[in-house]
Amino acid sequence: STELTGERVLADGQKLQHSATADIDVHRPNMLRAKMVSPRAVREIFYDGKMATISIPAQKAYSTVEFTGNLGELINKLEERYGVEMPMADMFLWGTPAAPLDKIESAMNAGQDFIDNDLCDHYAFRQGNVDWQIWITTGAKPLPRKLVITNRSDEARPQSVQYFDWNLKPTFKDSIFKFTPPKGATAVELRSLDKK
């Protein structure tokens, strides 16, 4: 799960902060269930290796598209073709050949910090118009605990901050990755960004 805080910059430069949470269940290489919750919306994404479904429970609406591929490919398709953003999207690419390591302009070890009670190595990176920092637990099971992204293309330098909590021994069944429409829900077309 993750807690996310982001900033929106108004025309006069004033920053507004917003928050959301996401619970994500993953069975690699090709199953995912994500629930994103903010005060403004609840959105769910299901992927069982054959079908990807986006559900908006408050509107009793969902869209399903056929897809076979790994999670990184799914996330890229949803964003590029449909404009759907996934929380923690980059984490599905890290450690794979698709990770955009060639785009990193600079990197540094910024020392160590505690995130909750976990001692973490702190790294800072510059990549295009983005600065990002990550805190990874030290020891036998290194996992990201915090991620900060700063948008350098905006003079106000808005940031997003994510804290991660990991469960490496989940007890779910594969059936949680298959979407079953709730009673009264309506299927709607997920329109491609290139359609007018």
Summary of predicted features, one role per range:
Residues 97-100:
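Edge strands and adjacent loops of beta-rich recognition modules
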Residues 53-54, 63, 102-194:
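Gly/Pro-enriched, hydrophobic low-complexity segments
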Residues 54-89:
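Acidic/charged, solvent-exposed loop-and-adjacent secondary-structure segments enriched in E/D, K/R, S/T
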Residues 1-61:
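N-terminal mature ectodomain segment of secretory-pathway/periplasmic proteins
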Residues 4, 69-71, 151, 170:
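Residue-level detector of flexible, active-site-proximal loop/helix-junction positions
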Residues 91-93:
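Extended amphipathic, helix-rich lipid-handling scaffolds
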Residues 31-46, 74-75, 185-196:
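Hydrophobic transmembrane alpha-helix bundles
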